[in-house]
Amino acid sequence: MEFDFDVHKIFLEPITKLDSSLIPSRRPLIASSEAQKQIMTVIDEIGKASAKAQRLPAPITSASRMQTNKHHLYILKDCTPKTAGRGAVIGFLKVGCKKLFVLDQKGSHIEAEPLCILDFYIHETLQRHGFGKELFTFMLKNEQVDVHHLAIDRPSEKFLSFLRKHFNLWSTIPQVNNFVVFDGFFRDWKASVKKTPAKRTEGEIKPYSLTDRDFLKQEEGLPWPFSQSQLNLNRASSLGSSPTRACSRHSPGEEDFVKSLRNCRPHSLHRTANSEQEDHSQRRRTSSLNRPQSIHH
């Protein structure tokens, strides 16, 4: 892919790595403001070409996206003599770490943050010339990552064929998201991974916790005489008889107590309480009258 400016002046190396600053490790040979503008143009154009090749509705690689994400962009330029004039861009590879929930071979959910292949493009006229393998191998060495530990975002069939041919990646582990991981992804894993606990089924959910159950067992019983009826209820339940019949039977002492409560009238109880208060106040007056007076000399 050619441009109307000199690519060799902004990309001094065969493969240039860019981050969110869009500044190459080796400074361009032109002014920084002009170099920044040209670099942004290259990123936008190769992003559009990649989206068109993958039949995407919109580019997933652009200068603005690079500036707002912690991604790494590897740009491969053509260094052959035929492009010695202004140069040309062959393709690019975009990677970045993402937090994912991936499934292992046993179906367990694993929380991981692997390096992900987010976009990969080689110009149509320069494919099957070894440029893709050169770019991919350079990225693996620079990121210091094993090819089996990569997660790939929505790879095309052509990309999967490329990985099988050059990196012997055949067997994949089925996932529920758009990422593809290969057999060996969890082998010799160096990054931090975290297994999420499996969700309990409805049958395993208890109505009370153990502490609640212990608390319910330690509840105090009802005071006498109501505790006797409760005891009879428990005995009847344990023997298999009807609890209603057990509750209807009362002991002789309990029957007398219940009858006395029924026959006792509220106003008579109130009168008795008032008479007790009057007697108590009368005793206090009498004691105060009988108390000897103090003698003053």
Curated annotation (Swiss-Prot):
It holds the Pfam family Acetyltransf_16. GO terms for molecular function: L-lysine N-acetyltransferase activity, acting on acetyl phosphate as donor; tubulin N-acetyltransferase activity. Keywords: Acyltransferase, Cell junction, Cell projection, Coated pit, Cytoplasm, Cytoskeleton, Membrane, Transferase. It comes from the Eukaryota. It catalyses: L-lysyl-[alpha-tubulin] + acetyl-CoA = N(6)-acetyl-L-lysyl-[alpha-tubulin] + CoA + H(+). The keyword NADP does not apply. Its main location: cytoplasm. It is found in: Cytoplasm; Membrane, Clathrin-coated pit; Cell junction, Focal adhesion; Cell projection, Axon. GO terms for cellular component: axon; clathrin-coated pit; cytoplasm; focal adhesion; microtubule; spindle. Residues 287-297 have a biased composition (Polar residues). Residues 269-297 are annotated as: Disordered. The record marks Q54 as: Crucial for catalytic activity. PROSITE patterns: GNAT_ATAT. Residues 1-186 form the N-acetyltransferase domain. Belongs to the acetyltransferase ATAT1 family. This is Alpha-tubulin N-acetyltransferase 1. The lineage of its organism: Eukaryota, Metazoa, Chordata, Craniata, Vertebrata.
